[in-house]
A protein has these predicted regions:
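Juxtamembrane membrane-water interface segments of multi-pass membrane proteins
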Residues: 1-19, 32-42, 60-78, 96-111, ...
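Alpha-helical transmembrane segments of polytopic membrane proteins
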Residues: 20, 43-53, 116-117, 167
Length: 174
């Protein structure tokens, strides 16, 4: 959805394809070796592949943002940018947790879970909702009236000031 919402096009998909395959091999490997004992070496290999896949994904997102036509970030894209930054931070923290004795650092794993759920997933969902929900409401309510009478723009479907307040409150909460 990010290329559509940022009006990006004409960018290579090499990093996206690499991210897809590397991430899936890493996830399949991790889920397979968890059923066996003495797989520490493979655990580190597959964890590294997962991290590498996320890095390629974030590089692809960066390329998409560099090729955008819209220079100004609207509120939905701002939420998404913060979500991807949080994904990068949680990847760093997750890598650290994976390679140390995390059972002695219980609070660190709680922080990691909080960052994933509220920093990455929630921010991304809210950001995409600011793009999708106004369109769906507009389409349902006003699409039949286009050309017959004045209809509001998509940006008029929600209060930008309240959205900015929500954005900063969510960042503060995370």
């Amino acid at each position: 959805l990010i290329p559509m919402f940022t009006l990006s096009h004409g960018f290579p998909l090499t990093n996206a394809k690499l991210a897809f395959w590397i991430l899936n091999v890493g996830l399949l490997g991790i889920s397979t070796i968890m059923h066996y004992k003495d797989t520490t070496f493979l655990y580190y290999i597959f964890t590294g592949l997962i991290v590498l896949g996320i890095i390629f994904f974030l590089l692809q997102i960066r390329i998409i943002f560099k090729n955008r036509i819209r220079n100004k970030y609207d509120i939905g894209i701002k939420f998404s940018v913060v979500a991807y930054l949080m994904l990068g931070l949680t990847t760093i923290l997750g890598t650290f947790i994976a390679f140390v004795d995390y059972q002695n650092i219980i609070n660190l794993t709680l922080i990691y879970g909080y960052m994933i759920i509220f920093g990455y997933i929630s921010m991304l969902i809210v950001g995409q909702m600011y793009k999708i929900v106004p369109f769906l409401v507009w389409y349902h309510k006003y699409s039949s009236k286009v050309g017959l009478e004045p209809v509001p723009m998509l940006k008029d479907m929600f209060n930008e000031k309240f959205a900015q307040i929500e954005f900063y409150l969510m960042i503060t909460a995370v």
